Amino acid sequence: MVEVKVLVEGYTNADSVEESGTEKSCPTITLVRDKNIVMVVDPGVLEDQQMLIDALKKENLEIKDVNIIFLTHSHIDHYRNVGMFQNARVLEYYGLWEKNTVDDWKEQFTNDIKIIKTPGHNYTSLTLLIKTEKGIVAIVGDVFWKERFPEKDVYADNASQLAESRKKVLELADFIIPGHGPMFKVEK
């Protein structure tokens, strides 16, 4: 069975940036392990590199052990640290990157890991649906910033697509790992 572990709990003050004057964000960085896959989802921003390295060490892993980086969407706060992972292939909206080539990804990545398109926040938004012992975990990027983020996403490319993507995720998932907060249970 697939193991899913939040390595770094994300944060953002984007919903209150007017009060502070400065926006600070780090995505929720997640580890996914399945057979020979050691995947990091949304490796984050430069100022949080050491926090990521330390979190991997707690899992008895080093940067070189990671073989796939999955990017939920193409916003820099989610992908800036991708260059740290020299041994990893990058899986994102346009495909699976190995050096300078890309192969189309398949909707069914493994038996227990499925990729779905969830546009709205960004047209490149993808969600991982992972079958675990606890149920289906959805790693959604900024489809949901955090559990109680306001309905209106001021950064959304397309609000109606985002609403549809959120609805789809809520129907499919038992737990959601949002873009900038702790995992939460879906109330059904």
Give short role names for the model-derived ranges:
Residues T22-K24, P119-N122:
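A short catalytic or substrate-binding loop motif that flags glycine-/basic-rich loops and adjacent residues
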Residues M1-V4, R33-V38, K106-K114, K131-V137:
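Beta-strand-turn-beta hairpins that frame and shape the catalytic cleft
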Residues S20, K24-C26, G44-N111:
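Active-site HxH/HxHxD metal-binding segment of metal-dependent hydrolases
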Residues Y123-K188:
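Metallo-beta-lactamase
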Residues S16, Q50-L52, Y79-N81, F149-P150, ...:
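Short glycine-/acidic-enriched loop or helix-start segments at secondary-structure transitions
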Residues T28-T30, K114, T124-L128:
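Short beta-strand micro-motifs in enzyme catalytic cores
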